[in-house]
């Protein structure tokens, strides 16, 4: 990630920037040696994105791992894997609008239809809202004016379509405007069978609530572009010294959000009631059942600049009682039999429902979670079937599952397991 304003530059264009430090796809030969395969894999064109998160995941259900990349000043890019390690950019085929100040992502089956959905975390902007409402823009601007509001739509929830690809539905609107957002995690915190979402918020909360954010939209983006500009660099340095000397905030005082999934039809924001509406600026989020009691806990980091610069790690134990939801979990060993569990898909069939999850790395914001999967089952007291599809195409049924417990999974050896 290349920081905006460095050397008097700003990402250009602000809605499709591809002018940052390069990303790499490195192939491991099994002996600790890596080869740059970015261009050979078809990933050269957009490698200059200012990316924050990326995951290999089976997005189209064909058994191989596709690639999704979420970037600031761009949004989401989606690549289909042809099964031989060659990727094709299918962003425009799979989503109608990929644009956002992309910060993170998470994958979950939010409407319990047996397909993985994608939540991209973006940002909203009170300044843009005011400008759009008043119909104000620079008369000399050559940018597409619609991109201001599209880029500041906020979070975009893409629901998986039966025929492939994704679409935004009204469910996306109920989770879109969480603030200046960072890490996120989807987990069934109340075990009702529908994944909820926790989102970290806030950039710089300073002593003053006066916010710098409007300056970008009114001035900064018109002064510089992606080319090094010493005069612009001096201007920005002087400006930041002045505004920070006056202790301006920048995307400050935005509490974290907890969105409870209401049966796949809407989300209800309840962070304050659950005691996790953290006001300090936060970054990383991981959701994990740390104590094995069947209730998913939270791990959150803060990055604070006032009244004292500090970083903290906070662990929030889930104490929710009375929900009555049953659950089942599966834990995968790391690299047993020489295999990585990343990309393994688990389907659980119960009470006429099919729930799905994948072992995924690289989601949230600069975070890594354990190789485990947790399903809330609601009132169901048994599951009819559980099955795993491994990244190499092998499938197996999980025998002797126990609900309200974590079930250990053995990674298969390199031989057919049958179907």
Label for each model-derived stretch:
Residues 74, 124-127, 204-206, 304-307:
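Short glycine/acidic-enriched loop and turn motifs that connect beta-strands
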Residues 5, 79, 129-133, 208-211, ...:
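Short, solvent-exposed loop/turn and secondary-structure capping segments
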Residues 110, 116-124, 151, 155-160, ...:
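Extended catalytic-interface subdomain
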Residues 18-19, 47, 71-72, 98-103, ...:
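Active-site-proximal structural scaffolding
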Residues 27, 51-61, 80, 102-112, ...:
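Beta-propeller blade termini
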Residues 248, 261, 266-282, 291-419:
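Gly/Ser/Thr/Pro-enriched helix-cap/hinge segments flanking short amphipathic alpha-helices
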Residues 1-49, 80-100, 132-179, 214-279, ...:
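Blade-edge motifs of beta-propeller repeat domains
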Residues 62, 66-71, 118-122, 197-201, ...:
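Hydrophobic beta-strand segments that make up the repeating blades of beta-propeller
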């Amino acid at each position: 990630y290349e920081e905006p304003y460095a050397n008097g530059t700003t990402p250009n264009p602000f809605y499709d920037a591809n002018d940052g430090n390069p990303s790499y796809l490195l192939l491991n030969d099994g002996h600790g040696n890596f080869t740059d395969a970015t261009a050979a894999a078809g990933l050269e064109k957009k490698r200059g994105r200012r990316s924050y998160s990326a995951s290999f995941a089976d997005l189209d259900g064909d058994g191989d791992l596709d690639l999704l990349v979420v970037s600031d000043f761009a949004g989401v890019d989606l690549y289909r894997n042809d099964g031989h390690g060659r990727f094709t950019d299918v962003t425009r085929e799979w989503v109608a609008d990929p644009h956002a100040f992309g910060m993170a992502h998470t994958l979950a089956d939010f409407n319990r239809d047996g397909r993985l959905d994608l939540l991209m975390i973006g940002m909203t902007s009170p300044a843009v809202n005011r400008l759009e409402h008043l119909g104000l823009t620079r008369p000399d601007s050559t940018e597409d004016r619609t991109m201001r509001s599209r880029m500041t739509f906020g979070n975009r929830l893409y629901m998986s379509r039966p025929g492939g690809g994704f679409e935004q539905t009204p469910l996306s609107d109920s989770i879109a405007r969480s603030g200046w957002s960072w890490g996120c995690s989807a987990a069934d915190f109340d075990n009702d069978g529908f994944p909820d979402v926790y989102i970290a918020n806030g950039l710089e909360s300073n002593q003053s609530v006066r916010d710098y954010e409007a300056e970008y939209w009114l001035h900064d983006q018109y002064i510089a572009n992606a080319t090094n500009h010493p005069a612009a660099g001096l201007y920005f340095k002087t400006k930041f010294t002045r505004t920070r000397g006056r202790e301006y905030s920048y995307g400050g005082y935005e509490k974290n959000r907890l969105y409870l999934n209401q049966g796949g039809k809407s989300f209800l924001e309840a962070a304050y009631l659950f005691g996790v509406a953290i006001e300090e600026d936060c970054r990383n989020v991981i959701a994990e059942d740390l104590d094995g009691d069947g209730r998913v806990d939270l791990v959150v980091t803060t990055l604070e600049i006032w009244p004292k610069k500090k970083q903290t790690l906070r662990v929030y134990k889930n104490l929710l009682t009375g929900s009555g939801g049953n659950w089942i979990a599966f834990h995968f060993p790391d690299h047993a039999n020489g295999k990585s569990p990343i990309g393994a898909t688990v389907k659980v069939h119960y009470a006429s429902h099919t729930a799905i999850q994948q072992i995924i790395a690289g989601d949230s914001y600069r975070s890594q979670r354990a190789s485990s999967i947790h399903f809330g089952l609601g009132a169901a007291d048994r599951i009819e079937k559980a099955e795993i599809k491994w990244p190499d195409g092998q499938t197996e049924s999980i025998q002797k599952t126990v609900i309200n417990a974590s079930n250990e999974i053995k990674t298969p050896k390199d031989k057919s397991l049958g179907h």
